[in-house]
Structure formats: structure tokens, C-alpha cells
């Protein structure tokens, strides 16, 4: 089965190059062979995509650079598109299918429709939809007028719907700003009321091997892990209410701030950190007895924690360390898988080999720790 998988990967690579060379028949032939050798949803989706094209095999010869629908002027100058884009996008060739795809995104009424998923879509469904569409509309791949804005809209849709809080607000209140924009300017306004906490390019890089941005990160506070979203408060259109109305709107926020402040006062911070933190006095290096995890403590730690209390602290240190490893392992796997997927899609052999050589040190260390725990 493993040999079939390798052969299937080879067929996929050939098929992707054929797609780039505008040879759909050849691409379809190798994709079908790959699906017979090692069936995968990705290959099936590519086959369906090729089969859905209006031109069927044998109707006309494969397009070349001279017959490809580039939508250029004969004199070599580029006509600006309906949304004002000229030069950058329209100097390169694009197909009628790409133009139609951009038009479809422009006409979508909500984020679910942009991604092509139902309102009950799971996180995995959202990831699959974004992964497929982001590659299809990325400015490096799609040069049709409006493709860049469509790419941004897809990124914003995923960023909002993948954030539980933003998705809840979006489902509850809809997108009033975008509706107003559509009534005023017609379809095709990508600037919607809900904003993403991450740029479309950063999101794309996070999925396909360009690293993880700092705007949406895992934060370790006092040795404990939590996930933070940088949430922006939506501006209200209806301003000018009386002072009482403003107070009523601000009251939930004031209560939340008060409760948070009281919580911070009532909860004591852990007596250790996983890295040096001079600001809280955690500068003295120690190592746990069981797993040998390095942690840092304050001046009076040795006096305050001995015997069973010390064992409890070190158990917490190791739990935090393992949680940290799991998180970093997940990110390393996502980065590697994203780069492999991108390399296969674009038929980039160098990128594929580079992705294969990428290490996952956190995953390796996690395996060692788990072996020690169960050994």
C-alpha cells in the first residue's frame, strides 16, 4: 500500500504540472490513476473540478499561450476591470472560469456562502473549504480582475467563522454593514461589517507553510496556557444617543472589567515560570526530578516549598511543559502539512522536498516524554 501511495503522489505531481500547462486531458488521466492506486478526497475533488469544466475532453485542442483566454487588449495595454484594478492583475493571463469564480464570490450574501459551507459546518469543514479556495484565488495563482479582493473576502470569512465568539455574533446579528453597502453600491462590495483579527496573507501563510503570525498566538502566562483572540469592538452606526443610552451600552463592559479585576486579585499566580521572568522574580533555575523539565522560581521558593508541596509544584510544571509541547507539535505538523499540500497543488518539486525535510522537534520531544511517562 505504501508503494501505491508513492506512485499515486508521482501521478498527482504529473497531473498538477499538466494542469499548469493547460493539458486537462493528461491531468485527468493521471489523477484517475492516482485515485485507483491510493484514493484520497483531494484527488477526487480535483477530478470533479476537471470534469465540471464546460469543455470536455476532445471538444477542442488544449489551449496554449496564444489561445488562452487572457482578456488582453491587442495593443498590449490593459483595460481596467470593473472594480478599478488594472495592470497588476490584468497583465497576466486568466481564464473565463477564473472570472466566473470571482463573480460568484462577489455575489455571495454571507460568509458561509463565500466558503461554500452550511451554517452547521464544523471547524474541519471550514478548514477544508478555506484550504481549497485560498489556493484557487491566491493572487499568485489567479490573475483575474477582482481575484485579490475575492482572496481577502475568503480569508475574512474563514477568520470570522473559525473564531467561536465572532461566529456567534455573526450568526446572531448578521452583517448589517455589508447589507447597507450592497444596497448602496450593488453586489461586489467585499468590505463587510465583521473584521478579521489576522490578515489574509498571514492566514494563508499559517495554512501553507509561511510561519505563524503574532496576531493570533498561544500565550503562556505564569506557566499556564490559554488561547487569546485579539477582538476588535465593532463601531456602532447609530451614535448620538443620550448619556443614559451610552451608559447602558457600557455597563456590561464595566461589569466585566470589575469582575476580571476581582478575579486577578483573588487568584494567586503560580510560583514558577517555564522561562526566566525577572519582572516577577522568577530567575533561579531548577529542574524537575521526574522528567528533567527546566523551570524558574523566586528567591524564597526553596523555603516555601518542600516535600509534598514541592512534588505538587513540579507535577504542575511538567503538565504545563507537556501542554506546551502538544501545542507546538500541532503547529509544526500544520506547517509541514500545509507546505506539502501547497507543493503538490503547484507541482513545485523543490518545495515538496523542502517540506519533507522539515523537522518537528516538539513532536519528537513529546514522544520522548510520553515514553518516559509510560515506561
UniProtKB/Swiss-Prot annotation:
Stretches assigned to the J domain: 112-176
Record PROSITE patterns: DNAJ_1, DNAJ_2
Segments crossing the lipid bilayer: 244-264
Annotated positions of the N-acetylmethionine modification: 1
Pros-methylhistidine: residues bearing it: 185
A Gene Ontology molecular function term of the record: Hsp70 protein binding
Keywords on record: Acetylation, Chaperone, Endoplasmic reticulum, Host-virus interaction, Membrane, Methylation, Nucleus, Transmembrane, Transmembrane helix
Principal subcellular localisation of the protein: endoplasmic reticulum
GO biological process: cellular response to misfolded protein; chaperone cofactor-dependent protein refolding; ERAD pathway; protein-containing complex assembly
Protein localization: Endoplasmic reticulum membrane; Nucleus membrane
Top-level taxon in the UniProt lineage: Eukaryota
Name of a matching Pfam family: DnaJ
Posttranslational mods: Methylated at His-185 by METTL9.
Residues on Cytoplasmic side: 1-243
Record has Transport as a keyword: no
Compositionally biased spans, kind Polar residues: 49-58
Region (Disordered): 45-92
Positions on the Lumenal side per record topology: 265-375
GO cellular component, one term: nuclear membrane
Membrane topology: Single-pass membrane protein
Subunit structure: Homodimer and homotetramer. Interacts (via J domain) with HSPA8/Hsc70. Forms a multiprotein complex, at least composed of DNAJB12, DNAJB14, HSPA8/Hsc70 and SGTA; interaction with DNAJB14 and HSPA8/Hsc70 is direct.
Function: Acts as a co-chaperone with HSPA8/Hsc70; required to promote protein folding and trafficking, prevent aggregation of client proteins, and promote unfolded proteins to endoplasmic reticulum-associated degradation (ERAD) pathway. Acts by determining HSPA8/Hsc70's ATPase and polypeptide-binding activities. Can also act independently of HSPA8/Hsc70: together with DNAJB14, acts as a chaperone that promotes maturation of potassium channels KCND2 and KCNH2 by stabilizing nascent channel subunits and assembling them into tetramers.
Protein family (similarity comment): Belongs to the DnaJ family. DNAJB12/DNAJB14 subfamily.
Protein name: DnaJ homolog subfamily B member 12
Annotated gene: DNAJB12
